[in-house]
Design a protein with these regions (language model features):
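Transmembrane beta-barrel wall of Gram-negative outer-membrane proteins
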Residues: 1-59, 85-87
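Short, contiguous strand/loop micro-motifs
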Residues: 21-23, 77, 128, 193-194
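Outer-membrane beta-barrel domain signature, especially the mid-to-C-terminal portions
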Residues: 23-25, 63-65, 78, 118-120
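C-terminal/domain-terminus segments
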Residues: 52-78
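Flexible, surface-exposed loop regions and adjacent strand-edge segments
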Residues: 2-12, 16, 64-74, 121-130, ...
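Face-selective signature of the C-terminal outer-membrane beta-barrel domain
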Residues: 41-55, 83-217
Length: 217
């Protein structure tokens, strides 16, 4: 079996032989994940929390693409996801009451920002293709419940979401000097994966759930 020794900065015109087929050459990557929760007990019946998440990675080579063949030869010199970045922020407010139609409830807001890219180049070509997507997701959830009596309980709520996607794509030729990538030619636009002028999607839903305890069994 053969593998590609190419990278962002290294140019290798031909595949190299993999002496140990049990090792997936040039497919390692690094990833950082941070997670933190905060909780504020306002009083006995009110609670506020905050969920924070962040992750980032190095380039992530896609192994199934790097071993794909065409006419008996490796097809791709490069195929990797660019650094995948994700930020998540979600505050939540909880309340506990003795009202007739509300024993407990919570409101949850969510914001998420995701960014990733796809990069590829064929063997025998100096042209690298770049596709990038940025996604923003907003959401608001409401969940409430109460007991009508000992046998009847209800839960109800809603969810609203809004998603916004922005896509960018271009290609450029690499400038090579002794197997080193020293720069690139001017970028040329290519078709994007999603509408380049931004696209969005929204949804809204409500629900109600009734539990009737017929007997102890």
């Amino acid at each position: 079996p053969f593998y590609s020794a190419n990278s962002r900065s290294q140019f290798s015109p031909v595949p190299l032989e993999n002496e140990n087929p049990l090792i997936q050459k040039n497919t390692a990557y690094d990833q950082l994940d941070l997670f933190q929760k905060f909780l504020v007990q306002i009083n006995e019946k009110r609670q506020l929390s905050l969920n924070l998440q962040y992750s980032n990675s190095s380039d992530i080579p896609r192994y199934d693409k790097l071993v794909e063949t065409r006419n008996g030869n490796l097809r791709y010199a490069e195929w990797y996801y660019g650094p995948q970045k994700r930020l998540f922020l979600s505050p939540q407010y909880k309340v506990f009451t003795d009202k007739k139609f509300l024993n407990s409830g919570r409101l949850t807001f969510g914001y998420q920002h995701v960014e990733e890219s796809r990069n590829s180049r064929d063997f025998g070509s100096l042209t690298r293709q770049y596709q990038r997507e940025k996604v923003k997701v907003f959401s608001l959830n409401g969940d409430f419940e109460f007991d009508l009596d000992e046998k009847h309980s209800f839960s109800y709520g809603f969810e609203g979401t809004y998603n916004k996607v922005r896509s960018l794509a271009y290609q450029y030729d690499l400038i090579i000097n002794q197997n080193k990538v020293e720069g690139s030619a001017p970028r040329l636009p290519i078709p994007t994966r999603y509408p380049s002028a931004k696209s969005s999607y929204g949804s809204f839903a409500i629900f109600i759930n009734w539990v009737w305890d017929l007997n102890e069994n």
